[in-house]
Amino acid sequence: MYKNLTIASLLGIVAVVLGAFGAHALKSKLTPEAMQSFETAVRYQFIHVLLLLFVNTFKEFSLKQKNAISFFLIGGIILFSGSIYVIHLLKVPAKSIWFVTPLGGVLLIIGWSMLFFQFSKKVIKKNS
């Protein structure tokens, strides 16, 4: 649990730094479309960092459940947001890593789906 919270905290720091960097240093260097893409990456990172913090402090989930959900969320953040950062900060052609961003999105969807499944099990159990 603390490992996941530590990773979430680090990813939160990175999101703040890259958000500020994007707002101040990149605005004049990126096209409006590229800036929008970069801001989307930062926003998704923030949202999923908050979800990671929630999942790992929710007392009704087992450590195994927390770790499983966190695995997909952390992987999704790194692949989804990370690939967008690589494209815009390192000028790597999107064509060369086109598959990474959607793969990250799929991992995020799996993480959300696992969260949904865990809550659904609790609702069904409570209503039985």
Segments (PLM) and residue ranges:
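Polytopic transmembrane helical bundles with strong interfacial aromatic enrichment
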Residues: 1-128
